[in-house]
C-alpha cells in the first residue's frame, strides 16, 4: 500500500509520554515497540516495493530495498492469535502463503533467476514473551531484548537461514527478513 500511494515517511506519535511512547516515561527503558521501530530504521530502505498476494487477512507484508546494502528487506506481520504462516518469496517478490501445517516444497526464485540455495538470508523475529502480545518483554528470535549492563541497546542479531526455505511466522509476531543481493529492478 505504501508503494501504491507513494508513501515516503513513517511517523510515530510519541517518543516519550502520551499513551504509549517508545520509551518508558519514568525509566526511559525502551518499550517493546522501540525494537520494531529500530529494526525498521536499520533494515528498510527508501525504495518501496509493491507486493501482491492473496491469502489470509491476518497477514501483512511490506517490502523495501534494503537500507545499506544491495537486496530487499521484507516485513511480515501476523495478526492471528492462533495461526502461523509459511511464506515463500519467489520471482519479483510474488509471495505465496500457506498455513504452517501445509508446508510444501516449491521451486525457489531469487530475484529474477532460479537460485541454488547456497546463500543465506537474515531473519529477525519479534514476539512478546510467551506469545503474549501485551508483554512488556520483547523477544528477538526467542531471546529477551534487555538493555546491557551499561544501559546500551542490545545487539540485534539475525538468524541466518537458507535463502530458498519458507519463512515461518508465528501467531502475533512480526518478522523482518533481509534477502542480500536480491535482484529487484527497482533497487538497482
Task: Give residue ranges: language-model regions.
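Substrate-binding and catalytic surfaces of secreted/luminal carbohydrate-active proteins
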Residues: 1-188
Amino acid at each position: 500500500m505504501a508503494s501504491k500511494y507513494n508513501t515516503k515517511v513513517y511517523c510515530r506519535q510519541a517518543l516519550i509520554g502520551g499513551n504509549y511512547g517508545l520509551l518508558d516515561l519514568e525509566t526511559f527503558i525502551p518499550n517493546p515497540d522501540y525494537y520494531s521501530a529500530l529494526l525498521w530504521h536499520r533494515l528498510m530502505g527508501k525504495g518501496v516495493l509493491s507486493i501482491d498476494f492473496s491469502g489470509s487477512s491476518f497477514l501483512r507484508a511490506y517490502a523495501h530495498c534494503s537500507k545499506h546494502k544491495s537486496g530487499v528487506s521484507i516485513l511480515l506481520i501476523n495478526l492471528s492469535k492462533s495461526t502461523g504462516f509459511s511464506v515463500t518469496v519467489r520471482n519479483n517478490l510474488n509471495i505465496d502463503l500457506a498455513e504452517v501445517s501445509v508446508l510444501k516444497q516449491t521451486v525457489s526464485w531469487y530475484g529474477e533467476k532460479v537460485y541454488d540455495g547456497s546463500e543465506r538470508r537474515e531473519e529477525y523475529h519479534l514476539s512478546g514473551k510467551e506469545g503474549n502480545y501485551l508483554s512488556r518483554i520483547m523477544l528477538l528470535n526467542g531471546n529477551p531484548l534487555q538493555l546491557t549492563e551499561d544501559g546500551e541497546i542490545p545487539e540485534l542479531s539475525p538468524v541466518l537461514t537458507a535463502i530458498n526455505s519458507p519463512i515461518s511466522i508465528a501467531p502475533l509476531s512480526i518478522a523482518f527478513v533481509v534477502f542480500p543481493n536480491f535482484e529487484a529492478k527497482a533497487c538497482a
